[in-house]
Amino acid sequence: ASGGPSWWKTPAGQKILTPDLYAKTLVPLLKPLGLKILLEPGRFMSGNAGALVTRVEYIKKTGKKNFVIVDAAMNDLIRPAFYDSFHEIVPLTKKTGALVSSDVVGPVCESGDYFAKDRPLPKVGEGDTLALLSAGAYGSVMGSNYNSRSLPAEILVRGRKASVVRRRQV
């Protein structure tokens, strides 16, 4: 990670604001006023604790664009649509060869139903499984039934043991 803790995944060159840097910057300004700093550490503490696993439904090429349409949608992880947040996307089957500039999008007919735009990714195909990383903070609580879509299952992994903590909604 660039400028942050070694475990926090960010796009190359992006510096994150750590609690330490935040405090070093604000304490000198706020202390003379008798004010305290409070922060809500959700994303910082749990962001990398989750991944959204999705399957490639099909590939669509139009002109210079390569669309990777997946079965997850903006209702499963809204942060890219709301905040243009970066989530590393990793094929769960090792891929070789040149990277392809790809837009990873969901099946909901909305302009905001995307997970990545113009992202260099290994060439993937129908049926491949992808993991969208850093989805632990707010991924679940911001999920919705938008467009009559069901909420996905949630799996807790501890060591080599996996447990269903929320069944897929039907």
Model-derived features with residue positions:
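Acidic, glycine-rich loop-and-beta core segments that form the ion-binding/anion-interacting portion
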Residues: 1-38
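Charged (often Lys/Glu-rich) extended helix/loop segments that serve as interaction or gating elements
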Residues: 25, 33-170
